[in-house]
Curated annotation (Swiss-Prot):
Xref: InterPro entries: Class_I_gatase-like, DJ-1/PfpI, Homeodomain-like_sf, HTH_AraC, HTH_AraC-typ_CS, INH-QAR
Name recorded for this polypeptide: HTH-type transcriptional regulator GbdR
SUPFAM superfamilies the record matches: Class I glutamine amidotransferase-like, Homeodomain-like
DNA-binding segment(s): 244-265, 292-315
Inducers of expression: The highest level of transcriptional activity is reached in the presence of choline. Regulated at the transcriptional level by a sigma-54-dependent promoter. Transcription can be activated by NtrC in the absence of a preferential nitrogen source, by CbrB in the absence of a preferential carbon source, and by the integration host factor (IHF), by favouring DNA bending. Negatively regulated by BetI in the absence of choline.
Organism whose genome encodes this protein: Pseudomonas aeruginosa (strain ATCC 15692 / DSM 22644 / CIP 104116 / JCM 14847 / LMG 12228 / 1C / PRS 101 / PAO1)
Length: 367
């Protein structure tokens, strides 16, 4: 998306051309959330305000994270001229970004293109060195890994970040908020509000909104003291706060602290704190090349053997095997296929499930 010269009447502006670079296993919902506001902007204005193209390195089909295939409009070597490029990431982002992607993005930056990303696409821009010194948003599952891998990038938990000629968004439907914000900047709030109404979108969220489900919903309670304690725990994983200190911070006794966790979370505060640290460790093991010793240290464990013991007890697999791919730790359990369905084409759901096994949230909800 370009920055228009002031004073140019809207009817005299050329359509903005946007290239969506699709990485392997990109999330379809993030792509749709970015493209659909552009389509609706054209429809409601009755003019071609935006045009868009999907791109891949070689112009061949790209698999989305749900197993569906998208045939792009062009490859990067014969891509039409665009004003900006938006990288669409998804599952297994470290494996999806290649040297060729980096070279292409760096070339776009040298040519003065604006660059954006949705879901985990920020990883590609960061790997190309194109986010150094910029504010950046990325899907929360990838946040810890990016903080470790790219210390020069100002990572944020915001839904989206717009910083000079870079705009990055977290996943899910957050790209829609970012695109509506950009459309509103360029064509007025009346248009962005009308687009929002067409999509039954109750509220256009802004840059001050943060991702992750609010603690009160995650914890299943409105207990404010408990929310405050958990927020403190999440913010202090590398150097865990003593439980007595936690109680002092929120002005409760140690005994009250214990009762709150038992009543609402059905575990002790120390057990819950340990769970948070182990979940962070799993993200780093799966998404970074940090050694097990380093992971243990940044997650608040002074002893690597103790870390390995706790990890195995919680996840059922030692950290070493998790790093190697854990096919034996948490296999995908398949239901028997009925005989009358055996000859039908394979569902793309199984392929998508297989690809997702490498994600840190795989099998994280116990049912």
């Amino acid at each position: 998306m370009t920055t228009y010269a002031p004073g140019v009447p809207p009817q005299n502006r050329n359509p903005q051309s946007i290239g969506f670079l699709l990485l392997d296993n990109f999330t379809l919902i993030s792509l749709a959330s970015a493209v659909e506001p552009l389509r609706m902007a054209n429809q409601l204005s009755g003019r071609e305000l935006y045009r868009w193209h999907t791109l891949s390195l070689d112009g061949r089909q790209v698999w989305a994270s749900d197993g569906l295939q998208i045939t792009p409009d062009a490859g990067t070597d014969n891509a039409p001229a665009v004003d900006c490029v938006i990288v669409c990431g998804g599952v297994g982002i470290q494996r999806s970004v290649t040297r060729e992607h980096v070279t292409f993005l760096q070339a776009q930056a040298r040519q003065g293109r604006r660059l954006g990303a949705v879901c985990t696409g920020s990883w590609a821009l960061a790997r190309a060195g194109l986010l150094d010194g910029y504010d950046c948003s990325v899907h929360w599952e990838c946040l810890a890994a990016m903080q470790e891998a790219f210390p020069r990038v100002a990572m944020s938990t915001r839904l989206f970040s717009i910083d000079r000629n870079r705009f990055t968004s977290s996943g899910g439907t957050a790209p829609m908020d970012m695109m509506l914000h950009l459309i509103g900047r360029e064509h007025g709030r009346e248009l962005s509000a009308a687009i929002s109404e067409m999509f039954i979108y109750e509220r256009i969220r802004n840059e001050q909104d943060h991702q992750r489900v609010p603690l009160k919903h995650m914890l299943g309670t409105n207990q404010p003291k408990l929310q405050e304690i958990v927020a403190l725990m999440e913010a202090n994983l590398e150097e865990p706060i003593d439980l007595d200190e936690l109680a002092v911070y929120v002005n409760v006794s140690r005994r009250q602290l214990e009762r709150l966790f038992q009543k609402y979370l059905h575990c002790s505060p120390s057990r819950y704190y340990l769970k948070l640290r182990l979940i962070r460790a799993r993200q780093l093991l799966k998404q970074t090349s940090m050694s097990i010793i380093e992971v243990a240290s940044v997650c608040g464990f002074v002893s690597t053997p103790h870390f390995s013991k706790c990890y195995r007890e919680y996840f059922g697999i030692p950290p070493r095997d998790e790093r190697q791919g854990q096919p034996l730790g948490q296999p995908v359990v398949l239901m028997p296929i009925p005989q009358d369905l055996a000859l039908m084409p394979n569902s793309s759901a199984l392929s998508a499930l297989s690809q997702a096994q490498g994600e840190s949230t795989f099998a994280s909800v116990r049912i």
